[in-house]
Amino acid sequence: MSNEQLTDAEINEQAAQLIDWELQGEMLYRQFYFKDFIVAFEFMTKVAALSEQANHHPNWSNVYNKVDIALTTHEFNSVSQRDFDLARKIDQL
């Protein structure tokens, strides 16, 4: 997973290619809804494993069947290639 800093144009271009993700300030954000808490927690466990593999961890929260995920690269105080790569992997779950 590349830790490449992106220009604003590159960020906007890649964000436009992702479904249901949106740019919020310096973060890439998405909400996920599941049948119930157990399914939401199973999803979070899978995301945690992906995040550990990538050594890149989301800001997230969970309330019952909803999981909010925000991705950012603190090193750049912006969205980087790592965030887009992780978002795409999360979308494959």
Predicted region positions:
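Solvent-exposed alpha-helix faces
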Residues: 45-46, 88
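C-terminal structural segments of small proteins and small subunits
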Residues: 67-93
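N-terminal first-folded block
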Residues: 1-35
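Short amphipathic alpha-helices within nucleic acid-binding modules
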Residues: 38-44
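A short N-terminal helical cap/helix-turn-helix that marks the beginning
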Residues: 55-59, 90-93
